């Protein structure tokens, strides 16, 4: 590359640095607590899951988010060792497994922390261990387990065709009448329910209506009827 080419490259590199910097330092105004249905995750992935999935919704992640504009990502970069997680490991493997590769749970938790959790701010999210403890508290203690919420509404993972409103209304019953966000994936001739997201305020003190939903025409849009779960 000649000098002229290098001169033209400088603004591009600078712009990229600014973009990354802004993305990692911006604030957020709510949290998404996203849980994924294991069989649907395996069915929608190009590479088969290494182990049979459980018929459960387990944690995908807890994500600081914005109702308008981009969400913050990669605010810090820190590798977490398995020994640091210590006695939390047994609980995390149950509620937050790496569904695609169960030999790499710690790698999955690292990716979720670095991309999303690291952008949380104290006192809501103080550090990586507090992030993991917060997720355990939400899923187990505060009963934000989507599988249990659906089960209380008599919606079980039986491979039946469901109505979107029935699923949404069931989640509303468990979240003080706040609207969740659904993600579906078309698989051959059926549309499977892949994820359900519960939203909370930026302090994780109360549920809110999820601001964003997949629009009609999106590959992740859930139809009014004919959702497999």
Swiss-Prot record:
Glycosylation positions in this chain = 77, 87, 145, 188, 203
Q: Which reaction does it catalyse?
A: a ribonucleotidyl-ribonucleotide-RNA + H2O = a 3'-end 3'-phospho-ribonucleotide-RNA + a 5'-end dephospho-ribonucleoside-RNA + H(+)
State the UniProt keywords alphabetically: Disulfide bond, Endonuclease, Glycoprotein, Hydrolase, Lyase, Nuclease, Signal
Q: Where does RNA bind?
A: 36, 60, 98-99, 108, 111-112, 115-116
Catalytic residues of the enzyme: 60, 112, 116
Query: What SUPFAM superfamilies does the entry give?
Result: Ribonuclease Rh-like (SSF55895)
Highest rank taxon of the organism: Eukaryota
A GO molecular function assigned to this protein is: ribonuclease T2 activity
Catalytic activity, EC: 4.6.1.19
PTM notes:
The N-glycans attached at Asn-188 and Asn-203 consist of either monosaccharide (GlcNAc) or disaccharide (GlcNAc-GlcNAc) that could not be distinguished.
Gene Ontology cellular component annotations, sorted alphabetically: extracellular region
Q: Biological process (GO) annotations?
A: RNA catabolic process
> What is its EC class?
lyase
The record, for Pfam families, names:
Ribonuclease_T2 (PF00445)
Q: List the disulfide bonds.
A: 42-49, 75-119, 184-222, 199-210
Identify the stretch annotated as signal peptide in this record.
1-27
Biological role stated in the UniProt entry: Self-incompatibility (SI) is the inherited ability of a flowering plant to prevent self-fertilization by discriminating between self and non-self pollen during pollination. In many species, self-incompatibility is controlled by the single, multiallelic locus S.
Family note: Belongs to the RNase T2 family.
Its protein name is Ribonuclease S-6
Provide the species name: Pyrus pyrifolia
């Amino acid at each position: 590359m000649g000098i002229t080419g290098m001169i033209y490259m400088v603004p591009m590199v600078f712009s990229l640095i600014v973009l990354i910097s802004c993305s990692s330092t911006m604030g957020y105004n709510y949290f998404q607590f996203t849980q994924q249905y294991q069989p649907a995750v395996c069915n929608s992935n190009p590479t088969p899951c290494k182990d049979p999935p459980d018929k459960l919704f387990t944690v995908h992640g807890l994500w600081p988010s914005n109702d308008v504009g981009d969400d913050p990502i990669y605010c810090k970069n820190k590798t977490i060792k398995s020994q640091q997680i210590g006695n939390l490991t047994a609980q995390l493997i149950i509620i937050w497994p790496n569904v695609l590769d169960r030999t790499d749970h710690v790698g999955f938790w690292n990716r979720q922390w670095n991309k999303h959790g690291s952008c949380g701010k104290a006192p809501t999210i103080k550090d990586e261990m507090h992030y993991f403890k917060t997720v355990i508290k939400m899923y187990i203690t505060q009963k934000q387990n989507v599988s249990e919420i659906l089960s209380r509404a008599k919606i079980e993972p039986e491979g039946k065709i469901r109505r979107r409103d029935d699923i949404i209304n069931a989640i509303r019953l468990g979240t003080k009448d706040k609207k969740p966000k659904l993600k579906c994936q078309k698989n051959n001739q059926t549309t499977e329910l892949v994820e359900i997201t519960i939203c909370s305020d930026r302090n994780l003190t109360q549920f809110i209506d999820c601001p964003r939903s997949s629009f009609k025409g999106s590959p992740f849009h859930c139809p009014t009827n004919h959702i497999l779960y």
